[in-house]
Amino acid sequence: MSQQETHGFQTEVKQLLHLMIHSLYSNKEIFLRELVSNAADAADKLRYLALTNDALYEGDGELRVRISADKEKGTVTIEDNGVGMTRDGVIEHLGTIAKSGTAEFFKNLSGEASKDSQLIGQFGVGFYSAFIVAKKVTVRTRAAGHKANEAVLWESEGEGSFTVDTITKASRGTEITLHLRDEEKEFADEWRLRSIITKYSDHISVPVEMWQEGTPERDGPDGEKIPATEGYWKVMNKATALWMRNKSEISDEEYQEFYKHISHDYTDALLWSHNRVEGKQEYTNLLYIPSKAPWDLWNRDRKHGLKLFVQRVFIMDDAEQFMPSYLRFVQGLIDSNDLPLNVSREILQDNHITKAMRTGITKRVLGMLEKLAKDDAEKYQQFWAEFGQVLKEGPAEDFANRERIAGLLRFASTHTGSAAPTVSLDDYLSRMKEGQNKIYYIVADSHEAAANSPHLELLRKKGIEVLLMSERIDEWLINHLTEYKEKQLHSVTRGELELGELEDAAEKEAQEKLAEESAPLIERIKAALGASVADVKVTSRLTDTPACVVTGEGEMSSQMIKLMQAAGQPVPEVKPTFEVNPAHPLVSRLNDLQDEAAFADWSNLLLQQAQLSEKGSLADPSAFIKLMNQMLLANLK
């Protein structure tokens, strides 16, 4: 009995269908790669479920994907005998996009076809790619373990809606028929389909078959009879797990196509590593570094991790237990000989085998990046532009590998004079001055604010390099990366400048003398500013600026306060140390003022200027403007 229903596509599906047809027209053949990839996944899922319920095979354990075409009708059919779908499953998977961050994805689309095609590729179009070439798509499917009369028919022309009906289907699995548009009839040609399968699906471990026509009986060249042959389903791909083959047998093109298969990325991977580990644990891993960051890299709900196989049997996607969060951009798989076939996420969580494999894989990825940085600096900069901020999470997460991760970090620097983050900590160490025992850095809201900070004045004068940090994550990073190769990282905006041997005896003596001579002025400023500052001192770091504010050692920096406030976290009140430069004309004129009210106003103005320079904002900008106008008016009289 028919149970036909009509459903409207989810809004995002309508958008995606429209975008695909208009943005992916230059690479139409990927529809076959996507549909074959889905069919192979369905076979993998059935193989996994059958581990605990062999009856799901229904006496047919030879899993495969079959592709056929009808030139006259203008159709292409992709059929598998995998896990299949129920009616509810069809409505869920073929009518909606069940992905977190979908709305954010659509916001990122620009309307420019070339850029959008990359984003859509990262999003993973899967089944919907059929509509790139088809005016209508028909799906017949039956879930493994369900009765023949519980099969489902799904049809749509890819516009606003789709129909679902109950049908009878003897065999389990899914059959997708594409009714090609008139201008896409080339894809009904068998040789065209074969070339696409060879190009995109050679690496898939499930056999991909096409019908090979038989030949009638015929006469041979010497008059002998050549017997007729029957038609048969011919395997068109190598149908072996690519990662189990020898590296020497696998071409770069095959590695890249396999990457696209597991990642659903349209762009090539930046680099990869394929290894077989033997010893206490035996496993194979194939790891890829993408060339582009996924659009949802910063989405907290985004799943990440490797595909897990046990003895060539697919177990799960997104096995995050094998990869730390700061390497969540890594794609690939791991195939273990030691884990049980019935392994679950819970078992993986506290498993000593898992922990040993995670340690090994993490070291492997860090090694890949170290080699890339050493061998191809330009390519490493490409990686850094995409994933550098994520890697900066590493020192906080992975104490054991903190030094290795630190060596992979890149920063802007006063040495290069550029905003590009190209300087490694090893580069910095190689240029340190004789007697220098600290790595100096500054964290600010922007590169310009860091590069032009008054806190750098003395260091610039002495030719001491300073690392310039301006990304949101930098303050978090620096709280967990306090030294590198026994050299302490020292903020130029926190506590004493501590130049050590870089400051000679004459300079120290002159500084002490200036502080002594300026003691009365310092006391007056302290009295004028009162509780708004923690302390007032003569500066040792300024040469051209009248004053600056400094965070005390152990106090929360202004950047960290901003991060905490942005996250809605309570922050303690932090009072700055106010450093003044008595050699600056403004400060020396201040010292001459006898009117204490005017002295207090000028002191407050200098303090707020320094805070504005340091933080980029003030707690009460209106009060600052009012005071400034008052001072201007007084001096215009």
Curated annotation (Swiss-Prot):
InterPro entries given in the database record: HATPase_C_sf, Heat_shock_protein_90_CS, HSP90_C, Hsp90_fam, Hsp90_N, Ribosomal_Su5_D2-typ_SF
- Positions of region (B): 346-562
GO MF term set: ATP binding; ATP hydrolysis activity; ATP-dependent protein folding chaperone; unfolded protein binding
Top-level taxon of origin: Bacteria
Query: Which SUPFAM superfamilies does the annotation name?
Result: ATPase domain of HSP90 chaperone/DNA topoisomerase II/histidine kinase, HSP90 C-terminal domain, Ribosomal protein S5 domain 2-like
Q: Record's Gene Ontology CC terms?
A: cytoplasm
The protein's matches in SMART domains, at most eight in alphabetical order, are given as: HATPase_c (SM00387)
Task: Kindly report the protein's main subcellular placement as a broad class.
Answer: cytoplasm
Segments carrying the region annotation (A) are: 1-345
Compartment(s) of residence: Cytoplasm
Annotated region C: where?
A: 563-637
Write out the entry's keywords from A to Z. Answer: ATP-binding, Chaperone, Cytoplasm, Nucleotide-binding, Stress response
- Family of the protein in this entry: Belongs to the heat shock protein 90 family.
NCBIfam families the record matches: PRK05218.1
Function text: Molecular chaperone. Has ATPase activity.
Subunit and partners: Homodimer.
User: Mind telling me what this protein is named?
Assistant: Chaperone protein HtpG
> What organism does this protein naturally occur in?
Shewanella sp. (strain ANA-3)
Gene, per the UniProt record = htpG
